[in-house]
Curated annotation (Swiss-Prot):
Organism name: Equine herpesvirus 2 (strain 86/87)
Keywords: Cytokine, Disulfide bond, Evasion of host immunity by viral interleukin-like protein, Glycoprotein, Host-virus interaction, Secreted, Signal, Viral immunoevasion
Lineage: Viruses, Duplodnaviria, Heunggongvirae, Peploviricota, Herviviricetes
Signal peptide per UniProt: 1-18
Protein's UniProt name: Viral interleukin-10 homolog
Similarity comment: Belongs to the IL-10 family.
Length: 179
């Protein structure tokens, strides 16, 4: 009888512990994200600075891939979707091509940048108030279309403008933290 009671208590405590752990990792309030965000953006910028010169030297185009309409989407009601789609775009389309067009020395740096972006995405997804989105962003579609039309040059353009993307992330997050 004592063993059964003890086992029941242990199962109950394990369930409570797991539930609390789940709530703290995936809860809507995410109290640590606003304080850790500047550090994550700093890490993204530092990782980008290691490949910035390489890609900007290869970018021979004068036009901008990431323009003001994308920033407006980030700041507006489509901010969540624009951010989510742009992170996905960089992770699934730009970064793999950037690695393929990099020297062996640059590949590890591009991979590190991608890992930091993945970490940011995971943290934002856990914090539902920062990525609660459903709609599509026309500005992101324009970026993707322009990127595709540029073919190989699109990789250099997108990577050379990664710092602009980080600034847009920061603008979006600043807006969300004020709400």
């Amino acid at each position: 009888m004592f063993r059964a009671s003890l086992l029941c208590c242990l199962v109950l405590l394990a369930g409570v512990w797991a539930d609390n752990k789940y709530d703290s990792e995936s809860g809507d309030d995410c109290p640590t994200l606003p304080t850790s965000l500047p550090h994550m953006l700093h890490e993204l910028r530092a990782a980008f600075s290691r490949v910035k010169t390489f890609f900007q030297m290869k970018d021979q185009l004068d036009n901008m891939l990431l323009d003001g309409s994308l920033l407006e989407d980030f700041k507006g009601y489509l901010g969540c979707q624009a951010l989510s789609e742009m992170i996905q775009f960089y992770l699934e389309e730009v970064m793999p091509q950037a690695e393929n067009h990099s020297t062996d020395q640059e590949k590890d740096k591009v991979n590190s940048l991608g890992e930091k972006l993945k970490t940011l995405r995971v943290r934002l997804r856990r914090c539902h108030r920062f990525l609660p989105c459903e709609n599509k962003s026309k500005a992101v579609e324009q970026v993707k279309s322009a990127f595709s039309k540029l073919q190989e040059k699109g990789v250099y353009k997108a990577m050379s403008e990664f710092d602009i993307f980080i600034n847009y992330i920061e603008a979006y997050m600043t807006t969300k933290m004020k709400n």
